[in-house]
Design a protein with these regions (language model features):
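Non-catalytic structural scaffold of enzyme domains
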Residues: 1-245
Length: 245
């Protein structure tokens, strides 16, 4: 099976990493739209344009399935994209909601991009099931992660401020509502003693096992920070190129 995966940058690689870890060996085409970072601080119209262009590319490449490995796109445009494009599309928000509802959690935290929080998709879906949801946006994190700057003292301070609303709230779970955030899971865990939820967890259950792994990575703007991030995230053979869309 040929699977297209896309995100605004390297964050979606956390989804790909989990799929490979669970032996979902397929042909993967990954697009990180780094030219248009960050999606979480963009507009709906721009996000539609970026997503449509990428999905049309996947269709041109004869992909069988597309995974939206971006919380911002999944929470704001998943219905639009599924209705518009004649290809199977999986978003990462729906499986997250289903997982949490089935676990009977009662008190959840959500840290995500501005646009994911503003969409209210996760919070409204969970509150319908009598789950209390505390939300807080973290608008600077994606850019800092992309630039490999999250080990600097001043940026750990920013992260600490983003996590402050979740402290001492007796949370069952803190949702990492952006696929970039698992990249800094170690730093987050050092600042808050709450179980962390990675949106990659339930995706693998939606994909059948495969036998042959092939990974092609494309970034719409390629630089050394991206190359470093890819090396740190993925533990498999891959080809990587810059892609003009």
């Amino acid at each position: 099976m040929k699977i297209g995966i896309f995100d605004s940058g390297v964050g979606g690689l956390t989804i790909l990493k989990e799929l490979i870890r669970k032996n979902k060996y397929h042909e993967y085409i990954y697009i990180g739209d780094t030219k248009n970072l960050t999606y979480g601080n963009s507009t709906i119209e721009n996000l539609k344009k970026y997503s449509d262009t990428i999905i049309n590319y996947f269709i041109k490449k004869r992909c069988d399935l597309v995974i939206i490995a971006c919380g911002t796109i999944s929470s704001n445009l998943s219905n639009y994209l599924k209705e518009k494009h004649k290809i199977k599309i999986i978003d990462i928000i729906t499986p997250t909601i289903d997982y949490i509802v089935n676990k009977n959690y009662k008190n959840i935290g959500l840290i995500a991009t501005n646009m994911t929080i503003q969409s209210n998709k996760i919070a409204s879906s969970l509150t319908k099931h009598n789950i209390n949801v505390i939300t807080n946006p973290a608008p600077k994190l994606v850019d800092l992660i992309e630039k490999n700057l999250m080990n600097k003292k001043e940026n750990i301070k920013i992260l600490k401020e983003y996590l402050a609303p979740f402290q001492n709230k007796n949370l069952d779970l803190l949702i990492l509502g952006c696929t970039h955030y698992p990249i800094i899971k170690k730093q987050i865990s050092s600042l808050i003693k709450t179980q962390l939820y990675d949106m990659a967890y339930p995706i693998s259950s939606l994909i059948e096992d495969g036998a042959i792994l092939k990974v092609q990575l494309y970034f719409t703007k390629l630089n050394n920070d991206i190359l470093k991030n890819v090396i740190n995230i993925l533990n498999c053979k891959y080809k990587i190129e810059e892609l003009k869309l």
